[in-house]
Amino acid sequence: FCGLFSSILWIGLPIVFFRLIFLNIDSFNGWDYYQILFLVGSYTIVDGVMMGLLIRSMGILESDILSGNLDQILLRPFDTQLFYIFRSFNLVQFVNTFFGLAIIFISYGNLNVHLNSLKILFYILSLMCGCIIYYSIWFLITISSFWFPTKFSKVDVFLNYIGISKYPYNIFTGINRLITMLFVPNLLIANPAVLIFLGKDTLNLFFYQIVFTVFLIIISR
């Protein structure tokens, strides 16, 4: 029950935050309230799936790195990364995915968006890339324990870092946006999918997301 309550609180806070902002303005850098709500919902879908898979597994991986138990795992005849991805689930976190779906359906009902099968396909593919980016960032932060062991958990580092993913990427402008995309790639988790869905982007950011996804796959292997 406590986990479910914290999930509702975690999802509800940004919704309330944006609602308060839009009490005084009609749009924010070209985004209205329901468009941002759609972004929050889309990110929550990715977050629910990946947190359900990884919130325990990444902690176990970090512990195995620090204790030396990883050496024994590496000698086993299976893919080590897949082993850790599916090693332990958190079912409460998976519930967030359904909250995310509810949010996007509610927001979609208030959006003037023309849908077609190609747009839906690109949206789904982009969210899948977002899942890979989400995992890769968390994995790379976790394995940094090889070189930079700390007294605090790398899980906390990741959770503090990933929160910005639910915000529109174009709150940054000019050179700041370029720097942000290079050094804060978590903004690529949900933004490209939502921009495609809303018709705000001509697939440019989506193609950049694909390239960056391939790059992360290579370096995380």
Predicted regions and their residues:
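Hydrophobic transmembrane alpha-helices and immediately adjacent juxtamembrane helices
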Residues: 1-221
